[in-house]
Amino acid sequence: MSNTITDKNQIKSEEKDVSSLRSLSEGITSDNDNNPKLKRRLNSIDFVKGLAIILIILSHLSDAWLNSEWRFLFGIGTAFLDIFGPSLFILLSALSVVFSIKKKKETIPEKVIRNKILFRGIAIMIIGAFFNLSIPHNPPYDVFPFNIFPLTLWGWNILFFMGFTQIASYFILKLNINVRIVIGVIIILIGPILREIIFYEIDTHPVFLWLNFFITSPVPQLPFLPWISICFISTTFGEYLFKMMNQGTEDALIRLYKVFFISGILFITSGIIIGFRLHTTSTIDINLYETIDWLTIANNQNFLQFQFPGMPEFFIRSTISNIFYLLGWALLIISISIYYIDIKGKKGIFNRMLIFYGKVSLSLFLIMFLTGYLFTEGFPPWFFVITYFGVVGLLGFLMYVWTIYFKGIGTPEWIMGKIGAIAHKKNNVEKN
C-alpha cells in the first residue's frame, strides 16, 4: 500500500515538473481542469505546431546550407511552404490565449489571467528583441537615433510579433465578436494601403518616418499592418473552438472541423481571386514586400528551361490577398489535423513525434538559428536532405532527453511556465 502511495506521489511530482513545457498551448491542451467536459485534449494543435516547426527548419536550413547552384530550390519551396510559417503560429498563439482565458476565468481571478498573459507575451517579445540586435539596419534606419540602443531592439520578427499577439488577443477578446470580424477585415483591406502611403511619405515629414518605424519597423518580417488583423479574426475562431471543446462530444468536434474547413476554403479562394496577378521586383517594392525576393532566388538557376514570369500576389507576404490566403490555409491545416488526429484518432509513431515537437516548438525554433551557422552554402540537395533529417532527428532526441531527464529546465517553455507561476503566486501574496 505504501509503495502504491509513493508511486502516485512520484507520478504527480513528474507531471508537475513537465507541465510548464506545455505553457504556450496550455489553454487548448491542458488536462488539469476540474470541469470534466474540458478534459479532452486537442492533440491536433501540437501536431500542427510540430509539423510547422520541422518545415520552418527545412526552409531556414535550405537558405543557409544549399550551395549557390541549388539555392533556387529555397526560393521555390519557401513560397509554397509559407503556409506553415508565421501565420499559422500567430493563429495558434491567439487560439491558445482565447481558450486559456475562457477556461480559467471561472476558477482564477481575472487579474491573474491577465498578468500571466502579459508576462508571457512580454517574455517572448524580449527574446524576439534580442534577435533584432543581430540584424543590421538598412536605410533610412541606419542613422541616429534608430541605429542606437534601445531602438535597435524594435522590429516585427516572428517572435516579437507572436509575443505581442498574446497580449493583443487578451484585449481584443473584450470586443463584441461581430466588431472583431469587421475590424479584422477592414485592417486586411486597408492595412497594406495605409502602410504604403506612410512608407512613401517618410521623406516629407519626421512623423511619417516614426510611424513607419513602428508600423513596418527595420525588421519588417510581419509588419503591424496588416498582420494584427489575424488577432481579430482568430479570436473569433478561438471562441468557437472553446464552445465546441466545452461540449466535449465527437459531434462537436466534427462541427468544429467543418467550420474551420469551410472557412479555410473560403479564405483561400478569396485570396487567390484577389491576388492572382503576377508581380516582379519592378512592379512591387521590395522594401515593403521582402518576400518578392523569393522570385529572384527561384529564377537564379540554370537547370530549368524557363524563368518564372512573376510571383502571384497571394504568395507575397503582407499583401491583402496574402493575408486571406495564409489565414485560410492555417484554418484548413488545423481542420484537417483535428479530423485525423482527434476525430479519427490517428496516433502512429510519426504523429506522436510531431506532437512532441509541437510541445517544444519554441525551443526548436531558437536552436534552429544556431544550427544554421554550422555550414554555409556548401551542400548539394541530396546531401542536404540527409543532413536535414539528421539534424531534425538529433534536435528532437536532445529535446526529449532535456525534457524527460532534466525536466526541461532552462527551455523557453519552462521559462514561460515559471512566469505564469510567478503571476499566480503574486496574486496569492496580495490576497494574504
Predicted features by range, described:
Residues 2-432:
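Alpha-helical transmembrane segments and their immediate juxtamembrane cytosolic regions
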